[in-house]
From Swiss-Prot:
Quaternary structure note: Component of the cytochrome c oxidase (complex IV, CIV), a multisubunit enzyme composed of 12 subunits. The complex is composed of a catalytic core of 3 subunits COX1, COX2 and COX3, encoded in the mitochondrial DNA, and 9 supernumerary subunits COX4, COX5A (or COX5B), COX6, COX7, COX8, COX9, COX12, COX13 and COX26, which are encoded in the nuclear genome.
Keyword Hydrolase tagged: no
Topology of this chain in the membrane: Single-pass membrane protein
Keyword field contains Iron-sulfur: no
Encoding gene, per UniProt annotation: COX13
GO biological process: aerobic respiration; mitochondrial electron transport, cytochrome c to oxygen; mitochondrial respirasome assembly; proton transmembrane transport
Transmembrane feature ranges: 44-71
PANTHER family reported in the protein's UniProt record: CYTOCHROME C OXIDASE POLYPEPTIDE VIA, CYTOCHROME C OXIDASE SUBUNIT
GO molecular function, one term: oxidoreductase activity
Protein name: Cytochrome c oxidase subunit 13, mitochondrial
Family: Belongs to the cytochrome c oxidase subunit 6A family.
Function: Component of the cytochrome c oxidase, the last enzyme in the mitochondrial electron transport chain which drives oxidative phosphorylation. The respiratory chain contains 3 multisubunit complexes succinate dehydrogenase (complex II, CII), ubiquinol-cytochrome c oxidoreductase (cytochrome b-c1 complex, complex III, CIII) and cytochrome c oxidase (complex IV, CIV), that cooperate to transfer electrons derived from NADH and succinate to molecular oxygen, creating an electrochemical gradient over the inner membrane that drives transmembrane transport and the ATP synthase.
Length: 129
């Protein structure tokens, strides 16, 4: 039915409208494309395997060594913080005028501690003058 309508109105169509859009298939070009596709797939697989090996043999040991180093550094920090807990206020350096200025109390807690106050690290030092 379509062909009948197309032939009837063929005079109003452009001259190439009823011809096939593509010529006959090129078997050699198709084979080259298939080989290129297979080579790309093999390259992708090899590259993926290479990055897996790099991740396992380079990245994981580097992370492990960094973790060991971090453990010892943080262990020293913990010992230092434990020591600072027992230091009396009189041995701490004096606060400067610009430190711990409160123009009005904070609306949380006791009004004197900042939002990110950490009682292990932060402390108010009271000196007798």
């Amino acid at each position: 039915m379509f062909r009948q309508c197309a032939k009837r109105y063929a005079s109003s169509l452009p001259p190439n409208a009823l011809k096939p859009a593509f010529g006959p298939p090129d078997k050699v070009a198709a084979q080259k494309f298939k080989e290129s596709l297979m080579a790309t797939e093999k390259h992708a697989k090899d590259t993926s395997n290479m990055w897996v090996k790099i991740s396992v043999w380079v990245a994981l040991p580097a992370i492990a060594l960094t973790a060991v180093n971090t453990y010892f550094v943080e262990k020293e920090h913990a010992e230092h913080r434990e020591h600072l807990k027992h230091v009396p206020d009189s041995e701490w350096p004096r606060d400067y005028e610009f430190m711990n200025i409160r123009s009005k109390p904070f609306f949380w807690g006791d009004g004197d501690k900042t939002l990110f106050w950490n009682p292990v690290v932060n402390r108010h030092i009271e000196h007798d003058d």
